Regions:
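Conserved Nudix-box catalytic region and its N-terminal flanking loop in Nudix hydrolases
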Residues: 34-70, 156-163
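A short coil-to-beta-strand element that immediately follows conserved catalytic motifs
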Residues: 76-84
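NUDIX/MutT-family hydrolases
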Residues: 110-142, 159-163
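Short, solvent-exposed loop/turn elements at beta->coil junctions and helix N-caps
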Residues: 14, 83-89
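N-terminal amphipathic/basic-hydrophobic helices that include classical n-h-c signal peptides
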Residues: 1-14
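Active-site-adjacent beta-strand/loop module that shapes the phosphate/pyrophosphate-binding cleft
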Residues: 88-108, 137-140, 145
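Conserved hydrophobic/aromatic beta-strand scaffold that supports enzyme active sites
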Residues: 28, 37, 97-101, 119
Length: 163
């Protein structure tokens, strides 16, 4: 491992180009035509979505998604692949979600206090209640030509930008 000097932050008076960022991960785990989804029960974001969680300070993104999948699903995933980024503004910063895919795993599926885990056939997606941005999220994850899902905010209006 090679050490690099840390760049000094600009002072408040010197127009800092840094911002506070909250880092999280989501992972699409597939088994053939099935995907593992979490039916979230928390009031802030209900419906079926991908499992995930926060990146701990000093933790690599790959280590974070492996740890979160173990905690949220009970599965040990191998070789997760980074396939995109979702981001949106939050008070005093930005919320960044690194989007991963995994097809290699071992273990037995468990649920957590975040919600019930369930294998869902891809042809059943239209029959279940997914979180509001699930279709756009899946579009970015599954289309190799896309890498970014961003919410743009103008006053009270939130617009989705996909690139």
């Amino acid at each position: 491992m090679r050490n690099f000097p840390l760049r000094k932050r600009r002072s408040e008076n010197n127009m800092s180009r840094t911002e506070n960022v909250e880092l999280t991960v989501l992972c699409l785990i597939t088994d053939g035509d099935r995907m593992l989804l979490q039916n979230r029960i928390k009031n802030d974001w209900q419906g079926y979505t991908l499992p995930g969680g926060h990146v701990e300070p000093g933790e690599s993104f790959v280590d974070a998604v492996i740890r979160e999948m173990k905690e949220e699903t009970g599965l040990d995933i191998m070789n997760p692949r980074l396939v995109g980024v979702k981001q949106f503004p939050i008070k005093d910063g930005r919320y960044v979600v690194l989007l991963f895919k995994a097809i290699e795993f071992s273990g037995t599926v468990i649920s957590s206090d975040e919600g019930q885990m369930e294998w869902v056939e891809s042809n059943r997606l239209s029959e279940i209640n997914t979180v509001g941005d699930f279709k756009d999220l899946m579009r970015v994850i599954n289309d190799p030509a896309l890498t970014e899902f961003q919410y743009l905010v103008d006053g009270d209006t939130w617009t989705v930008s996909i690139k």
